[in-house]
C-alpha cells in the first residue's frame, strides 16, 4: 500500500493543476491581499503589521504588531466572500501561523459595525490548548472548542479548517482533530446582507484577544474538496477520514467541488521528487503486493467453493441445522458449553440451560467442563445440627452464580458430622449481551394496490425500525414509517339525475283551454363513464286557461302600428308604449326628431350638425373628408345620447401611415392641408424627409447626392461646402465649390479676403472712391459707400441715388426718404412722414427711440398690461396677449379679440374660412374648410404646407434680410458694432468682427413660435458669447439664449464683477437702466443681477462650444403657458437640453441673433414657424 501512495503522490499534483488552470478567480480569497497588503510596487504601506519571511517564500508573511490598525476587508470583497460561503454552504480556511507561546488570540473575526460585538470569531487558546469557534446568531450564542489543538508553541504550523453546514473539522498539519458540531448551519451566521452591518477583520479579537505572532497565507478556499487540499499538502494517510459525501456519518453536503484555483492564488505545491533508488524500491514493493493480492484471491475462491458445497448439502438434506458453522442432522443433540444443550428439530436449532441440584456441603465446587457444583466425600450426616438458614442472595446479578446457607453445631458436645454450609447454583437472569445502538429503517415495502377500483385513491407502503432495532436507549428511527401517495383509476360511472323543472311555458291560448309545457334536463349530474340514464320523462304538460274566452277588443287594431294591444275579459283594451323613435300614448305616435333634441348626437362641423332625421330614428352623416370615425344611427333619445358620433382629424404622423424616413420627423400640418404632413430630416441628416443622408455641417444639405423623386433637387443635392454651413449653397463661379468655402469665388486670381469684388471678375481691382468695393461691383463707384445700401433695390446705391426709396419723390423733398410713401402724409407736421414716423401723432422731428422698440420716446409710455410688447394705447387687443398684432380685416381690432376676423358676417366659430371673406361658405368637398381658403388659409398665395405662418398673412417665410441693429453697450470711445453679412435670402447671417454686445432683430412678431438654426464658429480666435433672442420687445426687455466657450471673468469690473461660465444659458432681460455698462456686465455674468438680468437655466455640464463644429438649436416658446425649452444638438446627438422651463415675463415678441465679443459666428439654415393655432 505504501507503494501505491507514493505513486499517487507523483501523479496527482500534475493532473490536478492541469484541471485547475481554466477556473475563474472567485474561489480563493487571500485576506491580506484583499485588504490591500502585498509586495507589489505601489501597494499601501503596511499598518499594524511588519513584513517578515515565512515558510512559503512565494507569499508574504506578516508579524502582527497592532491588529487594531489593520483595516477590515472591503465591503464589496466581503460580499463576494459571503456569496461564496452561501453558495457552497460552507468554506475551507487555510492559515500558516507562528503564535507566541501560551498566548490567546483571534486569527480572524466578524464584528458588527455598530460596536455590538462579534458575530463570528476564530480564537487560538494557547493555555487551554484549544481552537475556539465563537458564533452569534439571532437569539443564540455558541462557543465550540476543538480540544488538543496546540498552536501557540512559538513554532510554525499550519491549519486547515473545514466547515460544512453544521459540522466543523480541523487539521493541524496532517493531524486530524476531533469533529465539532454547530447549533446552526454556518450560512445562517454568514447571512446575505451581513456585509452592510459587519466587518471582517484579520488578527482582530475582543478585549486582549488580538493575535500575537506571525501569519501567512490566510485564505478562504472554495471550489475544491478537503481531500484535494490534504493531498496537495502531502497528507495522503488522512484522505480516507476526511469529510466527503460518501461518508454518511458526517452528514456533509456535496457542495464542495474538486478544483482549487482562485483569487490571485499561487500554484499549488507539488510533491517532492524521488530518487532512482526510491523508484526501484517502489516497483519492487508493487510486485510483492501483486503476489499478495493473487494469494488472497485464491483463498477467497476456496471459501466460495466451500459455501456452495454447504448450500448444496442443505438443499439435498431437508431438516438439517447449521449451528456455529457445524452441520447437524435432524434430531441430533449436542452440547454447546457446560451449561447449554441444543437439539436440531426440522432445521430449527433449540437450545436449553442445564438445571443443577442443591449441594449439601461447604466445599462444593464446579469442575472444569461441567455446569453444576459437586460436594466432596468429607461431608457427613447432619445430626445435631441447627436448622438451615435462608439462602444468601445470588452471587451475581446475571448469568450463573451460587447461593449459600449455613447451620450451627456444638462440636464440644456433639460429633457435628456434615457441612455447616450448603451451596447451589443460581441464575436470576441471563446477562444482557447487547450494546447501545440507534435504530435504522428497513427498506420500504412494495406499494400496496390502489385503495379504490375507480376514481382517485391512494397507495401505501411501510418500513420498520428494525435494521437494526434500537436497544439500550438507542435513538428511535427518524421520519415516518408509512408513506402514502395518490393513485388514479378509470373514472367511476356516474348515473344521471334529473335537474329542476323549468317554469311552465306560455299557455297556447289565453282562454278556452290550452296546453302548456315544462321541461327538465338529465344534467344533475349528467350520466358519464357508462353510468345509467335518468329514469322518467324529460317533459310534462298540463291544461291551462280553462276559462271561457271574452270578447277581444284588440281585433279592431285600435293601437298604433307596432304597439302591443292588451285586451281584458270585460272587452276593454289597452295600448302599450310607442315604438322606439316615436312619442305618444300608444294610439297616436309621432316621430321624434333626435337631431334636434340631441344637438350633439352627430359630429358638428363649422356649426352645422351633420345629422339626418328619419321616421323613425336618425342617422349621422359619414365623417367629413380627412376625418375618421364611426357613422352611428338609431332610434330614440336614449340611443342618440348613448351613441354619439365622434369624428377625429386624420393624423398620419400619429397613426403611422406616413412614409417619412427613419431618420426624419413627421410634422403634422393639419387635416385641411394637402398633404397633411411634412417629413423633415432630423439633425445630422438632410434630404427631402422621404430620403435622408448624412449632413456633417447641419446646413440642410447632405454630404452626398441623394436619389429623391424625379426632378427634385431641393436638399437632395450634395453639399458644395460639406464642412462649413452654407444653407443657400451660393456658387457664383459654378465650379461645384460653394462661395462659403471657395477662396476665389469669381476666379479672377484674387483671393476673396483681398478681392474688392468678391463675386465679379476684376483682376485689375480698380476702386475709384476708395471704399474697398471695386468699381465693377460698386453700386456707387464715385461715392464712398462701403455698406452698399440700396433701399429700393434698383442697382443704384443710396449714396448716389436721388430717390432712395423709389417713390418718385426726390430725397430732398421726401419726408420718408427710405420708406416708399407717395402720399407724403405727415399728421403731426414734424417733417417726418407717417410711414416712417415713430410717433406719427406727436411732433418729434428728432425721432429719438432710446429703448429700440420702434416707438419714439415722445409717445412711448411702456404701459403694457398684457405684456405682449405693445403699449396699451397702440395695442389692437390691449387685454389679450397678441404679440403678432394680426388684424386680417384691418378694422383696428386684432384677430385675438375680434369675433369675425375677416368681417364677412360669419362668426369665427362657424366660419369655414376665418381669415378670408366668404359669406357663401361654399365647401365643395364637405371637409369643413371653405373653397376660398382650401389650401391657403391666410390667402397669402403660399400653400399652407410651405407657409411658416399659415394663419398670418404678414409672415410667409423665414427672412432676416431686413433687421434692426440694437447695440447693448452703445457708449464708449472704442465702440465696435457687429458686422452682419446676410446670405440665403435672409436665412443665413454671418457676424464677422469681434464686437460689443449687440442684436440683429427681425421685424416679424410672434406669439407662440418654434425657432431653429445652425450655429458655427469659423475661427480659432476668441472664446466668448453668441446665441439668439426671442420675445424681444425692446432693448431692455427680451429673452436671450447665449453660449460661452470657456469660463472667464469680464475684463471691466465696473460697475459689477461679471463671471461668465462656459455652457449654454437661458436668461430673461428686464433692465431698469437699458443698454449700457450695467446691462453689458449683467449679460456676461452667469447668474442673477437685480434690476437687469435673471438666469432661467444654465447647462449643469457647462459644455462650451468648439471651434469649427456645427451645432443645431431648437427653441420652443409658448407664452400662453410660459413654456420654454431649448435643445442643442451636436451632429446627431443631443448635447444639451434645458427641459421644460416656465416663465411668463413676456407674452411674445420678435426674434433675433445675439453676439458679445465673438467674431466669425455663422447662423445658418434659420427657420421660424408660428404655433398659434
UniProtKB/Swiss-Prot annotation:
Compositional bias per record (Basic and acidic residues), positions renumbered to this chain: 886-897
Pfam families referenced in this protein's UniProt entry, alphabetically: EGF_3, TSP_1, TSP_3, TSP_C, VWC
Keyword Disulfide bond: yes
Domain of life: Eukaryota
Residues covered by region (Heparin-binding): 50-98
UniProt keyword Lipoprotein present: no
Ranges where the EGF-like domain occurs: 550-590, 649-693
Subcellular location: Secreted; Cell surface; Secreted, Extracellular space, Extracellular matrix; Endoplasmic reticulum
One GO term describing the cellular component: extracellular region
SMART domains the record matches: EGF (SM00181), EGF_CA (SM00179), TSP1 (SM00209), TSPN (SM00210), VWC (SM00214)
The entry's keywords: Calcium, Cell adhesion, Disulfide bond, EGF-like domain, Endoplasmic reticulum, Extracellular matrix, Glycoprotein, Heparin-binding, Repeat, Sarcoplasmic reticulum, Secreted, Signal, Unfolded protein response
Positions of region (Disordered): 838-935
Secretion signal span: 1-18
S-S bonds: 174-235, 394-426, 398-431, 409-416, 450-487, 454-492, 465-477, 507-544, 511-549, 522-534, 554-565, 559-575, 578-589, 595-611, 602-620, 623-647, 653-666, 660-679, 681-692, 708-716, 721-741, 757-777, 780-800, 816-836, 839-859, 877-897, 913-933, 949-1170
Domain TSP C-terminal: 961-1173
Assembly and interaction partners: Homotrimer; disulfide-linked.
Family membership: Belongs to the thrombospondin family.
Described function: Adhesive glycoprotein that mediates cell-to-cell and cell-to-matrix interactions. Can bind to fibrinogen, fibronectin, laminin, type V collagen and integrins alpha-V/beta-1, alpha-V/beta-3 and alpha-IIb/beta-3. May play a role in ER stress response.
Name of this chain's protein: Thrombospondin-1
Lineage: Eukaryota, Metazoa, Chordata, Craniata, Vertebrata
Amino acid at each position: 500500500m505504501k507503494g501505491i501512495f507514493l505513486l499517487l503522490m507523483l501523479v496527482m499534483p500534475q493532473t490536478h493543476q492541469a484541471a485547475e488552470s481554466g477556473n475563474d478567480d472567485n474561489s480563493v480569497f487571500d485576506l491580506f491581499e484583499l485588504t490591500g497588503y502585498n509586495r507589489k510596487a505601489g501597494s499601501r504601506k503596511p499598518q499594524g503589521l511588519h513584513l517578515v519571511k515565512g515558510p512559503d517564500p512565494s507569499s508574504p508573511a506578516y508579524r502582527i504588531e497592532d491588529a487594531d490598525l489593520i483595516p477590515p476587508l472591503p465591503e464589496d470583497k466581503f460580499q463576494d466572500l459571503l456569496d461564496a460561503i452561501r453558495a457552497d454552504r460552507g468554506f475551507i480556511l487555510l492559515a500558516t501561523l507562528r503564535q507566541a507561546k501560551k498566548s490567546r488570540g483571534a486569527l480572524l473575526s466578524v464584528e458588527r459595525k455598530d460596536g455590538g460585538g462579534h458575530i463570528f470569531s476564530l480564537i487560538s487558546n494557547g493555555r487551554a490548548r484549544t481552537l475556539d469557534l465563537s458564533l452569534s446568531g439571532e437569539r443564540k450564542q455558541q462557543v465550540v472548542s476543538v480540544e488538543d489543538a496546540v498552536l501557540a508553541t512559538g513554532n510554525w504550523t499550519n491549519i486547515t479548517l473545514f466547515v460544512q453546514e453544521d459540522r466543523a473539522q480541523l487539521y493541524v498539519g496532517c493531524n486530524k482533530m476531533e469533529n465539532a458540531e454547530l447549533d446552526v448551519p454556518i450560512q445562517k451566521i454568514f447571512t446575505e446582507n451581513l456585509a452592510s452591518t459587519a466587518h471582517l477583520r484579520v488578527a482582530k479579537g475582543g478585549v486582549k484577544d488580538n493575535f500575537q505572532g506571525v501569519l501567512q497565507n490566510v485564505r478562504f478556499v472554495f471550489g475544491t474538496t478537503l481531500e484535494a487540499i490534504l493531498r496537495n499538502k502531502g497528507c495522503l494517510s488522512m484522505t480516507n477520514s476526511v469529510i466527503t459525501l460518501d461518508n454518511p456519518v458526517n452528514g456533509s453536503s456535496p457542495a464542495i467541488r474538486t478544483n482549487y484555483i482562485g483569487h490571485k492564488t499561487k500554484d499549488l505545491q507539488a510533491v517532492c521528487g524521488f530518487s532512482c533508488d526510491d523508484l526501484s524500491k517502489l516497483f519492487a514493493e508493487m510486485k510483492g503486493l501483486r503476489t499478495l493480492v493473487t494469494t488472497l484471491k485464491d483463498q477467497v475462491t476456496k471459501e466460495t467453493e466451500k459455501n456452495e458445497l454447504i448450500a448444496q448439502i442443505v438443499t439435498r438434506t431437508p431438516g438439517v441445522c447449521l449451528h456455529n458453522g457445524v452441520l447437524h442432522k435432524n434430531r441430533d443433540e449436542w452440547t454447546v458449553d457446560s451449561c447449554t444443550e441444543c437439539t436440531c428439530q426440522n432445521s430449527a436449532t433449540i437450545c436449553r440451560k442445564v438445571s443443577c441440584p442443591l449441594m449439601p456441603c461447604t466445599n462444593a465446587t464446579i469442575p472444569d467442563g461441567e455446569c453444576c457444583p459437586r460436594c466432596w466425600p468429607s461431608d457427613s450426616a447432619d445430626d445435631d445440627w441447627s436448622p438451615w438458614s435462608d439462602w444468601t442472595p445470588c452471587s451475581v446479578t446475571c448469568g450463573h452464580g451460587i447461593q449459600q446457607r449455613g447451620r450451627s453445631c456444638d462440636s464440644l458436645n456433639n460429633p457435628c458430622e456434615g457441612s455447616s454450609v450448603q451451596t447451589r447454583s443460581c441464575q436470576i437472569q441471563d446477562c444482557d449481551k447487547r450494546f447501545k445502538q440507534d435504530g435504522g429503517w428497513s427498506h420500504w415495502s412494495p406499494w400496496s394496490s390502489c385503495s379504490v377500483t375507480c376514481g382517485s385513491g391512494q397507495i401505501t407502503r411501510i418500513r420498520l425500525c428494525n435494521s437494526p432495532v434500537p436497544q439500550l436507549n438507542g435513538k428511535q428511527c427518524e421520519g415516518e414509517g408509512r408513506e402514502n401517495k395518490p393513485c388514479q383509476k378509470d373514472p367511476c360511472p356516474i348515473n344521471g339525475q334529473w335537474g329542476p323543472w323549468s317554469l311552465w311555458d306560455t299557455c297556447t291560448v289565453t282562454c278556452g283551454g290550452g296546453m302548456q309545457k315544462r321541461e327538465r334536463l338529465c344534467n344533475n349530474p349528467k350520466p358519464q363513464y357508462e353510468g345509467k340514464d335518468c329514469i322518467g320523462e324529460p317533459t310534462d304538460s298540463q291544461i291551462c286557461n280553462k276559462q271561457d274566452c271574452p270578447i277581444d277588443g284588440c281585433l279592431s287594431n285600435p293601437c298604433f302600428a307596432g304597439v302591443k294591444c292588451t285586451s281584458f275579459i270585460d272587452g276593454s283594451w289597452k295600448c302599450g308604449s310607442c315604438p322606439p323613435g316615436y312619442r305618444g300614448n300608444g294610439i297616436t305616435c309621432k316621430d321624434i326628431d333626435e337631431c334636434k333634441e340631441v344637438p350633439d348626437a352627430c359630429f358638428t362641423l363649422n356649426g352645422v350638425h351633420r345629422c339626418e332625421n328619419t321616421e323613425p330614428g336618425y342617422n349621422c352623416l359619414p365623417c367629413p373628408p380627412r376625418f375618421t370615425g364611426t357613422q352611428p344611427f338609431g332610434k330614440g333619445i336614449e340611443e342618440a345620447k348613448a351613441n354619439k358620433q365622434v369624428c377625429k382629424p386624420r393624423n398620419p404622423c400619429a397613426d403611422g401611415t406616413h412614409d417619412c424616413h427613419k431618420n426624419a420627423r413627421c410634422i403634422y400640418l393639419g387635416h385641411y392641408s394637402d398633404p397633411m404632413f411634412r417629413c423633415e430630416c432630423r439633425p445630422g441628416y438632410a434630404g427631402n424627409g422621404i430620403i435622408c443622408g448624412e449632413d456633417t455641417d447641419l446646413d440642410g444639405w447632405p454630404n452626398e447626392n441623394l436619389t429623391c423623386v424625379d426632378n427634385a433637387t431641393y436638399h437632395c443635392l450634395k453639399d458644395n461646402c460639406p464642412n462649413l454651413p452654407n444653407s443657400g449653397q451660393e456658387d457664383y463661379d459654378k465650379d461645384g465649390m460653394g462661395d462659403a468655402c471657395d477662396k476665389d469665388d469669381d476666379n479672377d486670381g484674387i483671393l476673396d479676403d483681398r478681392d474688392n469684388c468678391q463675386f465679379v471678375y476684376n483682376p485689375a481691382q480698380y476702386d475709384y472712391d476708395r471704399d474697398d468695393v471695386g468699381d465693377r461691383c460698386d453700386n456707387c463707384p464715385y461715392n464712398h459707400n462701403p455698406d452698399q445700401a440700396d433701399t429700393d433695390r434698383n442697382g443704384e446705391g443710396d449714396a448716389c441715388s436721388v430717390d432712395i426709396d423709389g417713390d418718385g419723390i426726390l430725397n430732398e423733398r421726401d419726408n420718408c426718404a427710405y420708406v416708399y410713401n407717395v402720399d407724403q402724409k405727415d399728421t403731426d407736421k414734424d417733417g417726418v412722414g407717417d410711414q416712417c414716423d415713430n410717433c406719427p401723432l406727436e411732433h418729434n422731428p428728432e425721432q429719438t427711440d432710446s429703448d429700440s422698440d420702434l416707438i419714439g420716446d415722445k409717445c412711448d409710455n411702456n404701459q403694457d398690461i398684457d405684456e405682449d410688447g405693445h403699449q396699451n394705447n397702440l395695442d389692437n387687443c390691449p387685454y389679450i396677449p397678441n404679440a403678432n398684432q394680426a388684424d386680417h380685416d384691418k378694422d383696428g381690432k386684432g384677430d385675438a379679440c375680434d369675433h369675425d376676423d375677416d368681417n364677412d358676417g360669419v362668426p369665427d366659430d362657424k366660419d369655414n374660412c376665418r381669415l378670408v371673406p366668404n359669406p357663401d361658405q361654399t365647401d365643395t368637398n364637405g371637409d369643413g374648410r371653405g373653397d376660398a381658403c382650401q389650401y391657403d388659409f391666410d390667402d397669402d398665395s403660399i400653400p399652407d404646407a410651405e407657409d411658416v405662418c399659415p394663419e398670418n398673412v404678414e409672415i410667409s417665410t423665414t427672412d432676416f434680410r431686413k433687421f434692426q441693429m440694437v447695440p447693448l453697450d452703445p457708449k464708449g470711445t472704442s465702440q465696435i458694432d457687429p458686422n452682419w453679412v446676410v446670405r440665403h435670402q435672409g436665412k443665413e447671417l454671418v457676424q464677422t468682427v469681434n464686437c460689443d454686445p449687440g442684436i440683429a432683430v427681425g421685424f416679424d412678431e410672434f406669439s407662440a413660435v418654434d425657432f431653429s438654426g445652425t450655429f458655427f464658429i469659423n475661427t480659432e480666435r476668441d472664446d466668448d458669447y453668441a446665441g439668439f433672442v426671442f420675445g424681444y420687445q425692446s432693448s431692455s426687455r427680451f429673452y436671450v439664449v447665449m453660449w460661452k466657450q470657456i469660463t472667464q471673468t469680464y475684463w471691466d469690473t465696473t460697475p459689477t464683477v461679471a463671471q461668465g461660465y462656459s455652457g449654454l444659458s437661458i436668461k430673461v432681460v428686464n433692465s431698469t437702466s437699458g443698454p449700457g455698462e450695467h446691462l453689458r456686465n449683467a449679460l456676461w455674468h452667469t447668474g442673477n443681477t437685480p434690476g437687469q438680468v435673471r438666469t432661467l437655466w444654465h447647462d449643469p455640464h457647462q459644455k462650451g462650444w468648439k471651434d469649427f463644429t456645427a451645432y443645431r438649436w431648437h427653441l420652443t416658446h409658448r407664452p400662453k403657458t410660459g413654456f420654454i425649452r431649448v435643445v442643442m444638438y451636436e451632429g446627431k446627438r443631443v448635447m444639451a437640453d434645458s427641459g421644460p422651463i416656465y416663465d411668463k415675463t413676456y407674452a411674445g415678441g420678435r426674434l433675433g441673433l445675439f453676439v458679445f465679443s465673438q467674431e466669425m459666428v455663422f447662423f445658418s439654415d434659420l427657420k421660424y414657424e408660428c404655433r398659434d393655432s
